[in-house]
């Protein structure tokens, strides 16, 4: 259910702005999106898991705040990240 270290490293390498970048908004949003996708799959089989559902809502909220910050500070980076992750269909 959680992200493996290899998958997390791949996400960081794919979305990092420079080498060693693990904290930029792009990297954080990519990791959160992966965790949200994993939890969404979990809820397809465990519909009554309300404790995890609360965690999912917190993750979605955190991702929304990061995306809002990125949109305010650099709209071009925001647009490229949205397209790369496939958000806003």
UniProtKB/Swiss-Prot annotation:
CC annotations in GO: cytosolic small ribosomal subunit
Gene Ontology biological process terms, A to Z: translation
One Pfam family in the UniProt entry: Ribosomal_S15
GO molecular function: rRNA binding; structural constituent of ribosome
CDD domains in UniProt: Ribosomal_S15p_S13e
Superkingdom classification of source: Bacteria
Keywords (A to Z) from UniProt: Ribonucleoprotein, Ribosomal protein, RNA-binding, rRNA-binding
Family to which the UniProt record says this protein belongs: Belongs to the universal ribosomal protein uS15 family.
Stated role: One of the primary rRNA binding proteins, it binds directly to 16S rRNA where it helps nucleate assembly of the platform of the 30S subunit by binding and bridging several RNA helices of the 16S rRNA. Forms an intersubunit bridge (bridge B4) with the 23S rRNA of the 50S subunit in the ribosome.
Complex formation: Part of the 30S ribosomal subunit. Forms a bridge to the 50S subunit in the 70S ribosome, contacting the 23S rRNA.
Record protein name field: Small ribosomal subunit protein uS15
The organism of origin for this protein: Caulobacter vibrioides (strain NA1000 / CB15N) (Caulobacter crescentus)
């Amino acid at each position: 259910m959680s992200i493996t270290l290899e998958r997390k490293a791949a996400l960081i390498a794919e979305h990092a702005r420079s080498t060693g970048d693990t904290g930029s908004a792009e990297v954080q949003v990519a990791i959160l999106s992966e965790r949200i996708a994993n939890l969404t799959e979990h809820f397809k089989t465990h519909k009554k898991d309300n404790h995890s559902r609360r965690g999912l809502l917190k993750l979605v909220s955190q991702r929304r705040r990061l995306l809002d910050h990125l949109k305010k500070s650099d709209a071009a980076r925001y647009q490229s990240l949205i397209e790369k992750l496939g958000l806003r269909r």
